[in-house]
From Swiss-Prot:
Belongs to the anthranilate synthase component I family. Part of a heterotetrameric complex that catalyzes the two-step biosynthesis of anthranilate, an intermediate in the biosynthesis of L-tryptophan. In the first step, the glutamine-binding beta subunit (TrpG) of anthranilate synthase (AS) provides the glutamine amidotransferase activity which generates ammonia as a substrate that, along with chorismate, is used in the second step, catalyzed by the large alpha subunit of AS (TrpE) to produce anthranilate. In the absence of TrpG, TrpE can synthesize anthranilate directly from chorismate and high concentrations of ammonia. Binds 1 Mg(2+) ion per subunit. Its EC number is 4.1.3.27. It comes from Thermotoga maritima (strain ATCC 43589 / DSM 3109 / JCM 10099 / NBRC 100826 / MSB8). It catalyses: chorismate + L-glutamine = anthranilate + pyruvate + L-glutamate + H(+). Keywords: Amino-acid biosynthesis, Aromatic amino acid biosynthesis, Lyase, Magnesium, Metal-binding, Tryptophan biosynthesis. The gene is trpE. InterPro entries: ADC_synthase (IPR005801), Anth_synth_I-like (IPR019999), Anth_synth_I_N (IPR006805), Chorismate_C (IPR015890). Feedback inhibited by tryptophan. L-tryptophan binds at S36, P234, Y235, M236. GO terms for biological process: L-tryptophan biosynthetic process. This is Anthranilate synthase component 1. Chorismate binds at G269, T270, Y384, R409, G423, A424, G425.
Length: 461
């Protein structure tokens, strides 16, 4: 365990997380920004910036490693995160800080399921998981207009944080036309194949997705800036780990652990926002009376209860919120919340693995749905439909807090190559043309953010 870290408090009324990130991350190989918008209107109270790395925990091509050594694993590889974090754990004594004061931030790709269940999944060019303990952590408190720098040497960052920000426009940037991994007719055919599996009783539902690839000279952070304006969401993230970048604006929790409480929040059922209050309420009533949407939502709530039942004490799993409407900037969703009290021998990693991947990006029953996804989708999912989030340092009882979002409404980069992807839930009466269009509808904000990012980076926005 490390020593106590220094905390420096500054007034932040002239700074934003975006401008601060651009100042302090310049030239850094490792950096992240985590932000939140609550229910489409107000920014969440805290934003987090991580700079540099104390160490990394990477699982790639079956090899688990840190910055300087390869690690053995006997059970699932992610179980190593607790002992690894213990090495870098530090104490921070400050009453004004939120519960997350340090730990590991990163992403887990969809193909990690191969190490949890007996499902073979295509590996991608991205690591199966990648976590970083940052050298410096900057926390914004938007309510009190304060910023806290947690570091061995916070004075080093202070001058960068308080320095004027100079943005240099770059007009000669390009983005190639995104190319799909499906022809339209080919997608229709795989929807029909999925429906056949449903009729034969293999599954109730499966989520089939369409991926697009493109090349660009855009700085991915400008895409993040555009996306956070166009599609603000409860989970907004930008992770730069070397030449790997994962960024997004996700509406959906994958799983969360705070103390002994584990929570999942299934989202299923969507309508656009109305142009007037009356139209908005009419769309809400229409959504809550849509039998197909309700049936799909109830199935995913049951799946969440079953997942938590594997790691929570008997009789403690309950539905805390049932089918409430949550409104975001462009859409409204039906949302439920399921929680339970952790068994004494289970921790945050157990919760993560019990709920991964979310039923909303796989289907039900989950394992058979993922086998069918593997058969019908032509390319690996990579980080898409995985998770982004953090594990906090273990406390004195060895408990880690964890918060993770499903990696949807997101971009993934390896150098100048970019990917984006979206899925549609296929059920017995799905219409292939509508499901194809749903994948495009979900990507609309992402395509738009590519256009806006070019204007921002070119100084035209």
């Amino acid at each position: 365990m490390g020593d106590s870290m220094h905390v420096l408090k500054l007034v932040s009324d002239l700074e934003t997380p975006v401008s601060t990130f651009m100042k302090v991350s310049r030239g850094e190989e490792f950096a992240f920004l985590l932000e939140s918008v609550e229910l489409g209107s107000a920014f969440g109270r805290h934003s987090f910036i991580g700079i540099g790395k104390k160490d990394v925990l990477v699982f790639e091509k079956g090899i688990l490693r840190t910055s300087n050594q390869q690690l053995d694993y006997t059970s699932s590889p992610l179980k190593a995160i607790k002992d690894w974090l213990e090495v870098y754990r530090y104490s921070v004594k400050h009453d004004e800080l939120p519960s997350f004061r340090g730990g590991a931030v990163g992403f887990v790709s969809y193909d990690y399921i191969s190490y949890i269940e007996k499902v073979k999944v295509k590996a991608s060019v991205f690591p199966t998981f990648y976590f970083v303990v940052p050298e410096h952590l900057i926390i914004f408190d938007h309510l009190k207009n304060n910023v806290f720098i947690i570091s061995d040497s916070p004075e080093e960052l202070t001058s960068k944080v308080l320095s004027p920000f100079e943005e240099k426009p770059e007009k000669n940037v390009f983005v190639t036309e995104p190319e799909s991994n499906f022809e339209r007719e080919q997608f229709y055919k795989v929807v029909e194949k999925a429906k056949k599996y449903i009729v034969e009783g293999d599954i109730f539902q499966v989520v089939l997705s369409q991926a697009f690839t493109f090349k660009t000279t855009l700085d991915p952070f400008y895409i993040y800036r555009a996306l956070r304006m166009i599609n603000p969401s409860p989970y907004m993230f930008y992770l730069k780990f070397g030449d790997t970048v994962v960024l997004g604006s996700s509406p959906e929790t994958m799983a969360k652990v705070e103390g002994d409480k584990a929570t999942v929040k299934p989202i299923a059922g969507t309508r656009p926002r109305g142009r007037t209050v009356e139209e908005d309420l009419k769309l809400e009533r229409e959504l809550l009376n849509d039998e197909k949407e309700i049936a799909e939502h109830v199935m995913l709530v049951d799946l969440g209860r079953n997942d938590l039942g594997r790691v929570c004490k008997e009789g403690t799993v309950r539905v805390e919120k049932k089918m409430v409407i949550e409104r975001y900037s462009h859409v409204m969703h039906i949302v439920s919340q399921v929680s339970g009290e952790l068994k004494d021998d289970k921790d945050a990693v157990d919760v993560f693995e019990a709920t991964f991947p979310a039923g909303t990006v796989s289907g039900a029953p989950k394992v058979r749905a993922m086998e069918i996804i593997e058969e019908l989708e032509p390319t690996p999912r990579g980080p898409y439909a995985g998770a982004v989030g953090y594990f906090s340092f273990p406390d004195d009882k060895g408990r880690m807090n964890m918060d993770s979002a499903i990696t949807i409404r997101s971009f993934f980069f390896k150098g100048k190559q970019g990917w984006l992807q979206a899925g549609a839930g296929i059920v017995y009466d799905s219409v292939p043309e509508r499901e194809y269009q749903e994948t495009l509808n979900k990507l609309r904000a992402l395509f738009r953010s590519l256009e806006v990012a070019q204007k921002i980076q070119g100084g035209l926005f």
